Amino acid sequence: DGKPWDSYPTEQIARDLRFFKYEPGAKWHGFEDYGPDQYFVDPCKFLLTTPGINIERGEYEPFGVPAGILAEYLRENGIVPEKADLNSILFLMTPAEDLAKMENLVNRIAHFERLLDANAPLSEVLPVLYRNHAERYRDYTIRDLCQELHDYYREYDLKSIQKAMFRKDELPRRAMLPQAANYELVRGNCELIPLSEARGRIALEGALPYPPGVITCVPGEVWEGVVLDYFLALEEGVNRLPGFTPELQGVYIEKDPDGRRRIYGYVLTRERARELGLRMGFGRGIPD
């Protein structure tokens, strides 16, 4: 109708499905390759986006508030979000929610915004995080932390890598079936190596980073391309900003003797790959 979404009364929004449609080409969501009336916003999911990305241009702004920082603040104040991505945070609405809980959530977010505007000391905003990593974040303010984490996202362009991981032409090559890869893992035909040394090697476990919470390298696929780049970028973040380690499944964070934390994964041994005659296609063999 040409009017802002929030100018309509709540009662009308609740009854009219138009308010929940993903319109193809709309700038606010950035999704592509779907048709009219194909997808709708789930009214039971309360999704907030945090500052840091220009929605119209899809580019990083000079300053941002990574959702993980807001999520940490809420957890330290007794509110557990369902999920926090790079610049979005999700809450699930259930029949158990009441007005008091919603008001508490809104009040906490508003208080966080006031602390951000005042550039309060990090020790006051996130006392648990600060206590656990006092040496790393000594004398930091909340905006200092937001800026550093935002700059890391921007340096590695994590939003673009995350999006590219699920494009068909960026998916890892499959060298063997997932079941066959699992058999090789169970039989011990594997080695645990840093992902920084895994390019071209065959994964034997499915690797799932959270965010986005989806398996990105299936057993039997080759560690390569943007999927490997994403995990290596996460590894850099683990070392730069302690306290914001993402949840990872199928790969393992280990501390090296030099103190650096690295992400490791199980891969098929080169000897076993050659025994199976795996050349991994596209004219490229098992790397030496």
At which residue positions do the language-model features occur?
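Non-catalytic terminal extensions of PLP-dependent enzymes
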Residues: D1-D288
